[in-house]
Amino acid sequence: MTESDRHDTPKGDRRISEGAGASPDESNPTDFAPEEFTPAYTPPLARSGTERPSFGRPAADNKELQERVDNLTARNAKLLDTLKDARQQLVALREEVDRLGQPPSGYGVLLEVQPDATVDVFTSGRKMRLTCSPNIDTETLHKGQTLRLNEALTIVEACEFDTVGEISTLREVLGDGKRALVVGHADEERVVHLAEPLLGEVDGEDGKRRRLRPGDSLLIDTKAGFAFERVPKAEVEDLVLEEVPDVGYEDIGGLGRQIEQIRDAVELPFLHKDLFRDYALRPPKGVLLYGPPGCGKTLIAKAVANSLAKKIAQARGDDAKEAKSYFLNIKGPELLNKFVGETERHIRLIFQRAREKASEGTPVIVFFDEMDSIFRTRGSGVSSDVETTVVPQLLSEIDGVEGLENVIVIGASNREDMIDPAILRPGRLDVKIKIERPDAEAAMDIFSKYLVETLPVHADDLNEFGGDRTACINAMIERVVERMYAESDDNRFLEVTYANGDKEIMYFKDFNSGAMIQNVVDRSKKYAIKSQLETGAPGLRVQHLFDSILDEFAENEDLPNTTNPDDWARISGKKGERIVYIRTLVTGKSSGASRAIDTETNTGQYL
């Protein structure tokens, strides 16, 4: 600044400059330096408010930098994980591409393992000798096993045995024990190899292990010539129920004479074989139980099997609880098959199984229920003549060249007149036992099996006998039987007209059965339960039994309505003069007049 400039400066301005300080260090920096001053540190972000000093870093900036470092570290770790996942996906995709690019594999069935570690395999319709991959141990391979082959026909994997194929019936196992003769469709016979699972024991019907036996159904591969497993066949297993029934003679009422007859026919030959041999007496081969429905034919057959098992166990000194016998319950109608020869085949299998069980010294009872449905008189068929071949098959099994030892055939039927006479002749079904309808004495015995002392009895009924429960139950039974068997107007059931013009009144007692008595007792128990729910007083009363009898009689009102009254009478157990007309006389349940049953107008009803 020149001298003239100093003189030209106003006084006020001079005071301001002098007040700022005389030295340049104390003056304003803008007045000291001709150039702009640059600070040593510039914050990265603009700050609002006053300017910060140019030296040092505050704590807020350090925290912000640390947060940025943490964020970058997290992003870096996430990026590394993403890269790893991408790498794994690339590796998996590469493996998938390599797998898809491989040539297809073939399969074969192992026939034989050679000493030089080569293997005979049946594949693509050819028998070939192949080599194994080093990771295959030939000692662990089994005949019939499925093998996987690569494109060079090298065995690379050992698989399981086949589980699908054709079903054939085993005829016999050949002498070497490794092959079998089987019969396929249309009786085509072939020899097949037995796979490893069939060389030993297989699972039987009862869950026990056993050897293969003729009649077993086998799963086979006809091309490879192998049988892989035994297949349980429902059509045969359902027809034959191997069991030891738990029904004893003491559970059967009113059939004392019939029980004695069948015990003499069945049990004596088994228990006293020496005496029969000394007297040269041949035991009977079969027993026919015939009579009206619901009178205990099946119960007797079961009791025979149970009693026979216990008696033989006792004779041998075995535990009676472990007594063993076989009761083959044959459901007659299910044996019938529309294919020619199938029914006969089932009969052969049944008796073949019975012979196998009997060969162990155990008695076997073959029980044919509803025998008239399958073994009816030859030539009597309307739609088919299936009985012309089924009946001879049974005859040959019972009385053929191949005898039956320890096997008893028991047949049950309510139409014995329809069974072929050749079956009923002596030497086949030798013993014929009629199971009759129960009379009053037998009915009391049957009632005592169901009205037991453990049942709750009403207090009023007990008080009549001084609290004696046994006397009360016996009195109930006597009064109920007297009511059922009374020839009163309330018990009239039918008026029957015979071909000669005679008429006869039939009562409900003429159609009583053990099954009906059980039903009466069950109804009375239901009435006792309902009465207890209504009144709160527990116990069975005589009136409950009387009400049950009325309901049972009323429900049987419609049953005689059949196409042929004579056929109905035969099933019901009434035989003799031919019946041409039936008129119901029930007055309990139906409010209408008595109904007549005419053979000419009522057609198409059930038997």
Swiss-Prot record:
It comes from the Bacteria. InterPro entries: AAA+_ATPase, AAA_ATPase_domain, ATPase_AAA_core, ATPase_AAA_CS, NA-bd_OB-fold, P-loop_NTPase, Prot_ATP_ID_OB_2nd, Prot_ATP_ID_OB_N. Residues 606-607 are annotated as: Docks into pockets in the proteasome alpha-ring. GO terms for molecular function: ATP binding; ATP hydrolysis activity. Disulfide bonds: none annotated. GO terms for cellular component: proteasome complex. The keyword Chloroplast does not apply. It holds the Pfam family AAA. Keywords: ATP-binding, Chaperone, Coiled coil, Nucleotide-binding, Proteasome. Residues 1-17 have a biased composition (Basic and acidic residues). Residues 1-65 are annotated as: Disordered. ATP binds at G294, C295, G296, K297, T298, L299. Pathway: Protein degradation; proteasomal Pup-dependent pathway. Residues 59-102 form a coiled coil. SUPFAM superfamilies: P-loop containing nucleoside triphosphate hydrolases. One of its GO terms (biological process) is modification-dependent protein catabolic process. Homohexamer. Assembles into a hexameric ring structure that caps the 20S proteasome core. Strongly interacts with the prokaryotic ubiquitin-like protein Pup through a hydrophobic interface; the interacting region of ARC lies in its N-terminal coiled-coil domain. There is one Pup binding site per ARC hexamer ring. Upon ATP-binding, the C-terminus of ARC interacts with the alpha-rings of the proteasome core, possibly by binding to the intersubunit pockets. ATPase which is responsible for recognizing, binding, unfolding and translocation of pupylated proteins into the bacterial 20S proteasome core particle. May be essential for opening the gate of the 20S proteasome via an interaction with its C-terminus, thereby allowing substrate entry and access to the site of proteolysis. Thus, the C-termini of the proteasomal ATPase may function like a 'key in a lock' to induce gate opening and therefore regulate proteolysis. NCBIfam families: pup_AAA (TIGR03689). Belongs to the AAA ATPase family. This is Proteasome-associated ATPase. It comes from Gordonia bronchialis (strain ATCC 25592 / DSM 43247 / BCRC 13721 / JCM 3198 / KCTC 3076 / NBRC 16047 / NCTC 10667) (Rhodococcus bronchialis).
